[in-house]
Regions:
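Class I SAM-dependent methyltransferase SAM/SAH-binding core
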Residues: 40, 46-96
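A short acidic, Gly/Pro-enriched loop at the edge of an enzyme's catalytic core
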Residues: 95-107
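Conserved beta-strand signature within the Rossmann-like core of class I S-adenosyl-L-methionine
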Residues: 133-141
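Short alpha-helix
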Residues: 148-162, 177
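A short glycine-rich, Lys/Arg-flanked "PGG" loop and its adjoining helix->strand segment in the class I
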Residues: 120-132
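Conserved SAM-binding loop and adjacent beta-strand
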Residues: 9-26, 147-148
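A short SAM/SAH-binding and catalytic strip from SAM-dependent methyltransferases
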Residues: 105-118
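Core SAM-dependent methyltransferase catalytic element
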Residues: 172-183
Length: 183
């Protein structure tokens, strides 16, 4: 990730106010997931959004994945005991998700896309791990909201190149572009 988040700023990343960036309740309505979904939070950071999904979906299994050992340790200390077997914490590489092919119902990537050196490669790997008709949710800064923000068209182009179709923009945030793609 080109501008990897500095773990010294962990409290900023873990600020509960960030949960207000996205209307998660509406997102879950739109996604219409089955009763016991398998979810991968790619670039999970401190697990703030992982925790929110685990709370809202009590029967889900969630894989919280990150490249940073500091963030993985933070999640292990602060989340693992509370969520037990429902939470799987794992180290990933920037372009590789360490999960089996066709194993995940939903991948979420929140404020990650603009930090990636090779977003198309990661999206191709996300496609690989998604089940047939699985979905990816990408939320990232709208242009002008963050110094590294990408255009919506650029993100959609990356998703198309990874074979996601259809791709739908959903209005869940004033600050973030929110896109759902299907395998």
């Amino acid at each position: 990730m080109s501008e990897k988040f500095n773990p010294d700023n962990l409290e900023k990343l873990n600020n509960p106010e960030r949960l207000n960036l996205i209307d998660l309740r509406e997102l879950l309505k739109i996604l219409d997931l089955k009763d016991d979904p398998k979810i991968a939070d790619v670039g999970a950071g401190t697990g703030l959004f992982s925790r929110a999904f685990l709370e809202k979906l009590p029967n889900c299994t969630l894989y919280a994945l990150d490249i940073s050992d500091e963030f993985l340790n933070y999640m292990d200390i602060n989340l693992q005991e509370y969520y037990g077997d429902r939470l799987k914490i794992g180290k990933m590489q920037e372009t590789h998700i360490p999960l089996k092919d066709n194993s995940i119902d939903l991948i979420v990537m929140i404020n990650l896309h603009h930090e990636l050196l090779s977003p198309k490669e990661l999206l191709k790997d996300a496609y690989r791990v998604l089940k047939e008709e699985g979905k990816i949710f990408i939320a990232d800064w709208k242009e002008g909201m963050h110094k590294g923000a990408l255009s919506k068209d650029s993100i959609i182009s990356d998703m198309k190149e990874a074979a996601f179709s259809p791709i739908e923009e959903v209005l869940l945030s004033n600050e973030l572009i929110c896109l759902i793609g299907e395998r």
